[in-house]
Regions:
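Conserved SAM-binding loop of SAM-dependent methyltransferases across substrates and taxa
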Residues: 69-84
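Class I S-adenosyl-L-methionine
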Residues: 1-18, 24-25, 29-34, 40, ...
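Phosphate-coordination loops involved in phosphoryl transfer and adenosine-cofactor binding
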Residues: 59, 86, 134
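Conserved class I S-adenosyl-L-methionine
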Residues: 58-68
Length: 273
């Protein structure tokens, strides 16, 4: 139990040390205080979603896709799930050594309702180790197409909420770059990504725009905001999607128009389904 200022009551000091949020002697330095601020700010967005699912009375399942070292899952368990007599967190990761380390840490901490699965995207959608429906899907700093993988997983699992912090959206930028000369003759909008730095930044932005449209086309209300304390990073965009049932009528059409206008037709399968 923690009595350290700045740390929420009841948090596991051992966990925070394992996650390098606390130093080995249980102290907060400037860097770890920044990390803690980031974690708590992200939790501020996720906690109401957890409460929403819990209030429905049908249990609570959360899958962290591309979990890495599963620090988000551990923090959520420590702050929310630990005090409950129900709920389960699944960490999905393709690197077996990280899955094993997370499993060992959960056992050591007594976090009994956490599972760590060494599965690919396609495997995770159909694996019997996961329930047919997952309430909340998270993907933190999921690189390149990993955010899209998490969205596909969330849609397949009929998730009530998705919480996404995308990272390194390089694929769309590479397609913009490949067709740059052709685009110059097609649309004046190509000026938006003419310099290489603009290609990278515009590619990242349009990737997330297309992701939001995809979610809206599947009946989700989407909000996009900035994470406080992550300003030093380009990876500070937070996408939260909550299922409402009514699809935005023109979302699919908008996606198709954007892909065509920007010479990204080859990415249709990734963003329109």
């Amino acid at each position: 139990m923690s009595q350290i200022p700045d740390i929420k009551p009841g948090q596991s000091v051992e966990l925070l040390q394992e996650l390098h949020i606390l130093t080995r002697d249980g102290k907060l330095n400037q860097d770890s205080r920044r990390k803690l601020k980031q974690v708590y700010h992200l939790y501020h967005f996720i906690e109401p979603l957890l409460q929403d699912v819990l209030a429905a009375g049908n249990g609570l399942t959360l899958a962290d896709h591309g979990a890495g070292k599963s620090y988000l899952g551990f923090i959520l368990y420590d702050l929310f799930f630990k005090a409950l007599d129900q709920g389960h967190i699944y960490g999905i990761e393709t690197r077996e050594e990280l899955v094993q380390k997370s499993h060992e840490l959960a056992e050591r901490l007594g976090f009994g309702r956490m599972s760590f699965l060494n599965l690919s995207v396609e495997q995770s959608i159909s694996s019997p180790e996961l329930p047919q429906q997952i309430d909340i899907v998270t993907a933190l700093h999921a690189c390149n197409t990993a955010t899209d993988d998490a969205i596909r997983f969330g849609l397949a699992k009929r998730a009530k909420h998705l919480v996404l912090v995308p990272c390194c959206q390089a694929e769309v930028a590479s397609v913009l770059r490949k067709h740059k000369n052709q685009s110059f003759g097609k649309t004046p909008l190509s000026e938006l990504w003419r310099p290489p730095i603009h290609t990278r930044e515009f590619g990242s932005q349009i990737t997330n725009v297309l992701r939001c449209l995809l979610l809206e086309a599947h009946g989700y209300a989407v909000t996009v905001t900035e994470l406080v304390g992550w300003e030093h990073s380009m990876k500070n965009e937070l996408i939260v999607a909550s299922y409402k049932g009514a699809a935005r009528g023109n979302a699919r059409q908008r996606s198709e128009q954007i892909l065509h206008e920007l010479n990204l037709d080859e990415m249709h399968e990734r963003f329109v389904y």
